[in-house]
Amino acid sequence: MIKVFGLLHKRSDISQTKFHSHWKGPHAVHAIKLVPVMRRYVQNHKATTAYPGMEPPCDGSPEVWLQSLEGGGTLNTMPDYINGAFIDEPNFMRVRSSGIAVSENIIIEGPPIGKKDKLTKVLYFLKRNPALTSEQFREQWLAHEGALLVGQNNLRRFVRSPTLPETYVDGDAPYDGVEEVWWNNKADFDKDKKSGGAHKAELRLLLDTKATTAMFVDENRVVWPGLSDDKD
């Protein structure tokens, strides 16, 4: 399954509250019309709690599941997109936004997540050490057993998604991969943050630690197929 992470920045003349309200409300209505090309769609809203010691990459990150990259091209030419979400974007966000296409690798499945479940989630947008090629980074990262920046004794779900090679065709990608980590609550995150992930020496070899970013996010699961609105 292919996923696309967008990197949205609010318009400079509107508040964070208005940005998140418009994206979650009127804009989400447009997105629902893009099924079935868009298999799932989650809005990752930057939470008010800042991630300790790291900058956020954006104000929000739409997460879209597609059957293929070609599906993404189809989505961008659909009349429902052109006459709906596309026209609405300047109402709340800075255009045009950037993003990356990734392949989803579920490391720890965890219990099913219902559409309305409230969890603690962090998105880690990873930038490789400039000494590594994208292929070298991908190989070394995928060989690492756990999450890079936190322990995993208390986490609920862990997904590791490397940026697709096709993303590099026109030059370097904004990020080389994403780690998504969920916990049942903030206290469980605090425990895993304290225990740490990879050794600092390993992180320096693998990552550009200054360009790697992270943020707590509040998930709005807009398109989340399942048996009901409350089941995965």
Language-model-detected regions and their locations in the chain:
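Macromolecular interaction modules
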Residues: 1-232
